[in-house]
Regions:
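Conserved ABC transporter NBD signature motif
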Residues: 80-90, 96-97
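Conserved ABC ATPase signature
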Residues: 154-158
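ABC transporter nucleotide-binding domain
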Residues: 197-295
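C-terminal coupling/interaction segments
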Residues: 295-336
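Conserved ABC ATPase "signature" region
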Residues: 24-28, 121, 125, 132-150
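Catalytic Walker B motif of ABC-type/P-loop ATPase nucleotide-binding domains
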Residues: 179-183
Length: 336
């Protein structure tokens, strides 16, 4: 199976104006500005096969939006090789642009003061969609996303959920092979999220649509994606299947530690932290004045309980869902 996306040694560096202190420094910066580099992406390598649905996960500032813009051809990488559907995205070739769609949840491609239908009709002409195909696809999209009564309203009068669903409709009208979704469900109600997730899964089965999805709502990732890529500080930290990610998560538990007698003070917690260093491969994800929380491999739980069974500490294993696991990963990496 040929690859949908190929990235090799991709770097993206921005140059930001240096901060200044004092009037003289500000005037100098105004006349002769100086800049400092900011590495948004560092040696990014991964491949995505055709027909895949990939969840691209990372905290704010991790490099997700920069990478999406590079994959769409909006930005060029500073260095490295990018191939999407066999094309160099930065060349913005017509053959490439006709094969992709892109929805940015915080931006609109619709004309603000005109009815949604006007934007859809215009895109029909831009992409040279046949009348019969246009009517069929528009009918399917409006029925599936509950937009029949919406597309004749001006965009400015739509709710956020209605607007995002109209954006999705616009970007699927020309039947792209690949759609990029950058935070498509941010701020949406439960019903709108469900309709979008359901339709994306339907299109994947019906027309082998490939999906590259970034979202802080991990419910989107769990519902729509088979694979996941996790990025942090511009570097890829995980690239594999959702099943592999679940196996990693199941190998760890969250352990909460507190003092049975709070009058013993922080010194006892400090003693606990020092003692835990012998295990090496555990992460402290919460360091509070009265309790500690660790991400601990399951195989070490029994040994830890045996070590601290003198009645000084309360040890509690806490439940973890997918979102908790991802958040704890980010916390453990931030301390590195």
């Amino acid at each position: 199976m040929s690859n949908l996306i190929d990235l090799t040694a991709v770097n993206k560096c921005y140059f930001l104006a240096r901060e200044t202190v004092g009037l003289a420094a500000w005037c100098k910066q105004l006349v002769k500005p100086s800049y400092e580099p900011y590495q948004a992406l560092a040696d990014v390598n991964f491949t995505v096969p055709k027909g895949a649905a990939v969840g691209f996960i990372g905290p704010n500032g991790a490099g997700k939006s920069s990478l999406i813009k590079i994959l769409c051809g909006i930005q060029k990488p500073t260095s490295g090789t990018v191939r999407v559907l066999g094309h160099n995205p930065s060349l913005r070739e017509k053959g490439f642009l006709h094969r992709i769609g892109a929805v940015f949840g915080h931006k609109t491609s619709l004309w603000w003061d005109l009815p949604v239908k006007t934007s859809l009709d215009t895109y029909k002409e831009i992409y040279k969609i046949k009348d019969v195909d246009y009517r069929k696809r528009l009918s399917e999209l409006t029925d599936s996303l509950n937009l029949s009564k919406v597309i004749h309203k001006p965009v400015r009068n739509l709710s956020l959920g209605e607007r995002v669903k109209c954006e999705l409709t616009l970007n699927l009208l020309h039947s792209p092979e690949l759609i990029f979704l950058d935070e498509p469900t941010v701020g949406l109600d439960v019903t709108s999220k469900y309709e979008i997730r359901k339709y994306l899964n339907y299109k994947r089965k019906e027309s082998n649509l490939s999906v590259f999805l970034t979202s802080h709502d991990l419910g989107d990732i769990e519902s729509c994606c088979d694979d996941a890529i996790i990025i942090d500080k511009g570097r890829i930290r995980f690239d594999g299947s959702m099943r592999d990610l679940s196996i990693i998560f199941k190998a760890n538990i969250k352990l909460n530690v507190s003092l049975q007698d709070l009058t013993l003070g922080e010194a006892r917690l400090l003693r606990f932290k020092e003692a835990m260093k012998v295990f090496g491969n555990i992460s402290l994800i919460n360091d509070g004045p009265t309790n500690l929380t660790y991400l601990v491999p399951k195989v070490l739980v029994g040994e830890i309980f045996d070590m601290f069974n003198d009645g000084t500490y309360d040890l509690e294993v806490l439940p973890m869902d997918f979102e908790n696991n991802v958040v704890n990963l980010f916390k453990s990496w931030s301390s590195e």
